[in-house]
A protein has these predicted regions:
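Noncatalytic carbohydrate-binding groove/subsite architecture in carbohydrate-active enzymes
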Residues: 69-77, 238-356, 362
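The substrate-binding groove and active-site-proximal loops of carbohydrate-active enzymes
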Residues: 87-95, 140-157, 175-183, 225-243, ...
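An active-site-proximal structural segment forming one wall of the substrate-binding cleft
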Residues: 90-110, 157, 164, 185-224, ...
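Aromatic- and acidic-residue-enriched carbohydrate-binding clefts of CAZyme catalytic domains
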Residues: 119-161, 201-232, 296-301
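Aromatic/acidic polysaccharide-binding cleft in carbohydrate-active enzymes
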Residues: 334-427
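Carbohydrate-binding surface patches
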Residues: 423-455, 463-466, 493-496
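C-terminal beta-strand-rich structural cap/linker in extracellular carbohydrate-active enzymes
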Residues: 477-500
């Protein structure tokens, strides 16, 4: 038995694992070969089995690279062999995740990481993660498209709470956990909070400690479900009905860990939900969740590329309008968690410079609106293969959005905001260094920039591209010499980073 189409790297050690049950002890041979099976890149044997489930592990180090390799599992004895979970991971994996992807997430400077969703939060049961990974039952998502085409719509709950917290700590992000108020009871969701934040004197805090994590995780941010009110999420989608569910869950969660920052769900901006959900929940939840996806340019007709691009850029202003609408209807004490935003083409779409310019405008707009519109959190959805990182079987790279995120973080994170608009942001750090980012979102026009009043420029980097069509990313250029005179002409669809 085996599997085709596996990408392997030469000299990379892999850990193979398999759970089996047999009538008697069996000798297994595991190998990585080419598609025909004639060229064997590596092979290992293991003896095991029996009338109870047993996990067998071997290490495999292929002597050649192949993007269409076969994993082959053979056994010598005739008889009954029942195979459960099978896995093949790089030996240097991080809690089942690829190390290169984790390092790329760290380099992006992500400060808040939301999990398990998104729509997936409506199907996730955190208690499944208390089992060993090989024993977690697969389930078929009713939103199966979100895990297609890799698993035929099934999910295997491979990441549990401990893995997620480890990831957050590794990349330096605050965890933001979304509960499932439809299929988990208030007591079960309160137990999740206790597992994360309780000390060893509590039942679930003791369980966490017994699993190797003595100190509480102290998770501050919790979302009371995802996208209730839209109709695609299971559960009560009326404002009053959701309010009751959220209230029951939130109270139990606060009993387990007082002082949590709870975020309520809903189809915001929505006047009815603001009145009959957000307002009565204000005693336990001081944030509402708001999502926005910009216009998705189809780029199927070359004669309409400029029109499609401009509509996408204009949708940033629409996002601002919707934030203002929510602010108008919400109580002043309730803040906004803009915890999903992106420009959305389709699942598994190739990224483009269009996305990068859109992201730069949104980040500028959020910095401008954060204080006056009461935006507490903002989460781009999602990092892997829908946004910042392009992850392939054997490498990971920044998309145009990822390039913008990485440099915006490098340029502005931790600084004091001096001035912000959709087109330009200026910040100053503790040493008095001034950092500026400027966006030229025009499709054809150049943009003159005069920064002579700031004095000599110490750094000047331009992100530019000849095309906005997918797949595309920015070319990064050092333009310090061109900026020496205090002025610069920005090309169309470009981003300029200046430091003084």
């Amino acid at each position: 038995m085996g599997q085709h189409g596996i990408t392997i790297s030469q000299g990379q050690p892999y850990l193979f694992g398999m759970v089996v049950k047999t009538q008697e002890s069996v000798k297994f041979t595991v190998s990585l070969t080419d598609r025909t099976g004639k060229n064997v890149y590596c092979r290992a044997t293991s003896v095991g089995g029996g009338d109870d489930w047993t996990r067998l592990e071997v290490e495999l180090t292929p002597q050649a690279a192949d993007s269409d390799a076969d994993l082959r599992i053979c056994w010598e004895n005739a008889g009954y062999v029942c195979v459960g979970a099978v896995s093949l991971l790089p030996k240097d994996h991080f809690h089942g995740m690829r190390r290169d992807v984790v390092e790329a997430m760290k380099d992006l400077g992500i400060k808040v990481l939301r999990w398990p969703g998104g729509n997936f939060a409506g199907e996730f049961n955190w208690m499944d993660g208390l089992l060993p990974a090989d024993m977690r039952a697969p389930f078929q998502s009713y939103l199966g498209l979100e895990t297609q085409p890799h698993t035929m719509g099934y999910d295997f709950s491979e990441m549990n709470t401990d893995d997620f917290i480890a990831l957050c700590r590794e990349i330096g992000a605050e965890p933001f956990i979304t509960i499932n108020p439809c299929w988990n009871t208030p007591d079960e969701n309160a137990a999740w909070v206790e597992y994360c934040n309780g000390d060893v004197s509590t039942p679930y805090g003791k369980l966490r400690a017994n699993r190797g994590h003595q100190e509480p995780y102290n998770v501050q941010f919790w979302s009371l479900g995802n996208e209730f009110g839209y109709g695609h999420m299971e559960g009560d989608n009326t404002p009053a009905g959701y309010c009751q569910i959220a209230l029951e869950n939130g109270k139990k969660m606060l009993e387990a860990s007082p002082g949590l920052s709870l975020c309520s769900s809903g189809p915001y901006p929505n006047k009815e939900w603001a009145e009959f959900s957000a307002k009565p929940l204000a005693g336990i939840s001081q944030m509402i969740s708001q999502h926005y996806y910009g216009y998705d340019p189809h780029y199927t007709d070359l004669s309409t590329v400029e029109e499609e691009y401009n509509r996408c850029m204009a949708s940033v202003s629409r996002m601002r309008e919707l934030i203002h609408q929510s602010r108008q209807w919400l109580e002043p004490s309730i803040r906004i968690s803009m915890d999903e935003w992106n420009v959305w083409y389709a699942w598994y779409r190739p990224s483009s410079v269009t996305d990068g310019i859109y992201a730069a405008l949104v980040l500028h707009m959020l910095m401008e609106e954060a204080e006056k519109s009461g935006i507490a959190l903002a989460c781009h959805f999602q990092a892997i293969n829908e946004g910042m990182l392009c992850v392939k079987p054997n490498h990971v790279s920044l998309t145009a959005q990822g390039q913008v995120f990485s440099w915006m973080n490098r340029w502005h994170m931790g600084n004091r905001l001096c001035s912000a608009s959709q087109e330009a942001v200026i910040t100053v750090d503790r040493e008095g260094r001034v950092s500026a980012t400027v966006v030229n979102a025009a499709f054809h026009r150049k943009k003159p920039v005069d920064f002579s009043s700031f004095g000599p420029c110490s750094e000047a980097v331009l992100f530019s591209s000849d095309t906005v069509l997918p797949p595309s990313s920015f070319t990064q250029s050092n333009v310090l010499d061109q900026a020496a005179g205090g002025t610069l002409q920005m090309p169309p669809h470009s981003v300029l980073f200046l430091r003084f």
